[in-house]
Amino acid sequence: MAAGSGSGSNPKDYQDPPPAPLVDTGELGKWSLYRAAIAEFTATLLLVCISVSTVIGEKRQSGEGGAGVLGIAWAFGGLIFVLVYCTAGISGGHMNPAVTFAMVLARRVSLPRAALYTMAQCVGAVCGAGLARAMHGGGQYARHGGGANELAAGYSAGAGVVAEMVGTFVLVYTVFSATDPKRKARDSHVPVLAPLPIGLAVLVVHLATIPITGTGINPARSLGPALVLGLGTTKAWSHLWIFWVGPFAGAAAAMIYHHYILRGAAAKAFASSSYRSPHF
């Protein structure tokens, strides 16, 4: 046990990880990086395949005991909980380019890792949507919109961007809070405590935003079904930009709020620079 440096001191029982380098060429030769990318690909494939199948199934059974909005929300939230629990120790369990983007801004992952993750997530999402299409058949898949995200009638593009931004803010803020080094040190004996709030955040965001955008909050999840449904020919494709702009803006805002306001990184940096500067 580390001793305090002075009487009455209360040393931290955790240690903040060092910031990741923006470019770490050394990790490019490590199998662990590619194993993590494979985990991101597989997890995103499963996420999109199962969640999109739930949406299509609900539309097919509408009025006949379909899952409904609550069932879809539980499918997404529960699946995120399971997949984060399974992959967090390998890749961090991002499954979402917006989450990966926020981690780059927070200096938790390097740019090469983020680029590889994002590529794996997008390819996994396309493969997951393709698998869902194979499960339901091309006709049923197209007839029920392929589970793709699109702006609901009566809502403006601006409203869609705001909904996606707010929803992603909630998700990424929860991710940062659940994986905070201080909380991880305190709750390390209960390994489900990080995936659980993340899954619940996804659930409640779906309840709030399904009526507006169908809930994207994940650019890869929106890209996969839109591509499989038809490149450049569908409403989902024309609305796709909403599901990239909103989530990336929300992710950046959540990182700034958690890292610089709640964690006080800006104040610490200012205090450190003031301490090092000469005084006259």
Swiss-Prot record:
SUPFAM superfamilies: Aquaporin-like. Its main location: membrane. The chain crosses the membrane at residues 36-56, 70-92, 113-135, 156-176, 192-212, 236-256. GO terms for cellular component: plasma membrane. Keywords: Cell membrane, Membrane, Repeat, Transmembrane, Transmembrane helix, Transport. It holds the Pfam family MIP. It comes from the Eukaryota. A motif (NPA 1) lies at residues 96-98. It is found in: Cell membrane. Residues 1-21 are annotated as: Disordered. A motif (NPA 2) lies at residues 218-220. InterPro entries: Aquaporin-like, Aquaporin_transptr, MIP, MIP_CS. The keyword Ion transport does not apply. The keyword Glycosyltransferase does not apply. Expressed in leaves and at lower levels in roots. CDD domains: MIP. One of its GO terms (molecular function) is water channel activity. It is a multi-pass membrane protein. Aquaporins facilitate the transport of water and small neutral solutes across cell membranes. Belongs to the MIP/aquaporin (TC 1.A.8) family. PIP (TC 1.A.8.11) subfamily. Aquaporins contain two tandem repeats each containing three membrane-spanning domains and a pore-forming loop with the signature motif Asn-Pro-Ala (NPA). NCBIfam families: MIP. This is Probable aquaporin PIP2-8. The gene is PIP2-8.
